[in-house]
């Protein structure tokens, strides 16, 4: 069962973020990491279980996705109203080239992810969408091309899309972001401090 907003875990999260916000005041923005619902279900159960239910179009899975999304939406509201979060950092997953087909994501999962993003945008104009590429598997970026956000962030090394090209590609963002390569074997792992700074 999902926790209520009165659950100690939820309240602890809100308390910690509120203390952080009070400590830094307006010195910097504060973003909270809110994964999409299917990623939460995968980490709570297993990839195999979720993908098996997805392939069979099990109604129970879609009911679970809906419930998780509803919890996340309510939690985002509390993060902003009670804890003073600036916006959300919304990692998108389950749309990579090694997973099920892009059409499957578009038809079955995209509506849930988009509704989560839209609710975040209703609560705050300062949300960042992150397109996960950590494991080095390229994403089907076309499924996220029109997601609205203040900033779109992706792994330029995995998805082979430069920031300049991404500025044109993503149609409903205000800004683009991209970081250094953070995978094993990259300079962040192997180089000395000087090389990392450069």
Task: Give names to the regions the model predicted.
Residues 1:
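Active-site gating loops and adjacent loop-to-helix segments of metal-dependent hydrolytic enzymes
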Residues 4-198:
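Active-site loop segments of alpha/beta catalytic cores
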């Amino acid at each position: 069962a999902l926790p209520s907003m009165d659950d100690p875990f939820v309240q602890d999260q809100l308390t910690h973020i509120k203390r952080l916000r009070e400590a830094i005041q307006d010195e910097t923005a504060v973003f909270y990491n809110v994964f999409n619902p299917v990623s939460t279900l995968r980490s709570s159960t297993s990839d195999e279980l979720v993908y098996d239910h997805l392939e069979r179009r099990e109604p129970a899975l879609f009911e679970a996705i809906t419930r998780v999304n509803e919890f996340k939406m309510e939690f985002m509201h509390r993060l902003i109203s009670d804890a003073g979060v600036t916006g959300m950092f919304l990692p998108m997953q389950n749309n990579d080239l090694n997973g099920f087909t892009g059409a499957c994501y578009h038809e079955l999962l995209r509506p849930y992810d988009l509704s989560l993003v839209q609710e975040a945008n209703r609560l705050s104009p300062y949300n960042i969408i992150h397109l996960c590429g950590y494991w080095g598997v390229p994403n089907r970026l076309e499924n996220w091309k029109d997601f609205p956000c203040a900033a779109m962030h992706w792994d330029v090394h995995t998805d082979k899309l430069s920031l300049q090209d991404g500025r044109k590609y993503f149609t409903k963002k205000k800004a683009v972001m991209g970081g250094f390569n953070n995978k094993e074997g990259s300079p962040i792992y192997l180089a000395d401090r000087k090389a990392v700074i450069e």
